[in-house]
């Protein structure tokens, strides 16, 4: 048996008539009452879930911790990566290409290879249980960001540097007054990359801040919250949405400049 569509002629409370598909001149009587099917899904948001998640997860503290780690690391990322990329793109010295190749090759080095010696080193100098292992390494440049910045810097004509040098500008003055202002799109792209990375970073804070819940960022806090309230999906979804609002907002307001910076770095003049 299966479903069959019939043309309704008369609809009644207890009895209805349909056209007989085998004999259109006759009617089929049907005994039964009508009822409306319930909607399988309804929009009924419970805003109390956001309030409860905000309180239970101690979201203000986690937000502050994550923002501080991200901003401190962002300062180091911009300072170190811009300086290194400027050196590779504007200065000629023996072994420049070889050194740049070695720097870029570190991108392919898995983090799992260095995590044990890195943790042992930070533990030896007493940094475990602090933000230092999560922030200080960013002051030593990142190969991926160096590559993006270097490629963008190379699209800026050298004639601009030469004209500034003739006017008496030092290399540092050329960097701060010419290169950096002209590289706003790629710098914003690097900023967004770092902020999203710091906001989503889970493994490093987990191993370095496992004994310090008051210093943990939002990714670790959400994982702990999920372990406690895993049987309550509304709370988990509310907390995850609140945690993702800032990266989404930053990307939306910077989307045009971000895409411009990423695209232009692939064009070398």
Regions found by a protein language model. Give the residues of each.
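A structural signal for multi-pass alpha-helical bundles of membrane permease subunits
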Residues: 1, 5-269
């Amino acid at each position: 048996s299966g479903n069959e569509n019939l043309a309704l002629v008369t609809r009644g409370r207890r009895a209805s008539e349909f056209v007989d598909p085998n004999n259109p001149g006759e009617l089929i009587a049907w005994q039964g009452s009508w009822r409306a099917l319930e909607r399988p899904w309804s929009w009924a948001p419970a805003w109390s879930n956001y309030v409860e998640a905000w309180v239970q997860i101690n979201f203000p503290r986690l937000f502050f911790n994550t923002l501080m780690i991200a901003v401190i690391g962002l300062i180091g990322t911009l300072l170190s990566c811009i300086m290194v990329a400027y050196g590779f793109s504007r200065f000629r010295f023996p072994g420049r290409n070889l050194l740049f190749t070695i720097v870029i090759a570190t991108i392919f080095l898995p983090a799992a290879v260095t995590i044990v010696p890195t943790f042992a080193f930070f533990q030896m100098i007493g940094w475990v249980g602090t933000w230092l292992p999560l922030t200080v390494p960013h002051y030593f440049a990142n190969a991926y960001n160096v590559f993006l910045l270097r490629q963008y810097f190379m699209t800026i004509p050298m004639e601009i540097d030469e004209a500034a040098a003739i006017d008496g500008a030092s290399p540092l003055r050329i960097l701060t007054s010419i290169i950096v202002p002209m590289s706003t799109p790629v710098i914003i792209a690097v900023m967004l990359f770092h902020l999203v990375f710091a906001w989503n970073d889970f493994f490093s804070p987990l191993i370095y801040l496992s004994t310090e819940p008051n210093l943990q960022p939002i990714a670790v806090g959400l994982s702990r919250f999920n372990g406690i309230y895993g049987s309550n999906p509304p709370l988990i979804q509310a907390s995850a949405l609140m945690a993702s609002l800032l990266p989404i907002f930053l990307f939306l307001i910077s989307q045009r400049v971000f895409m411009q910076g990423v695209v232009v770095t692939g064009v070398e003049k």
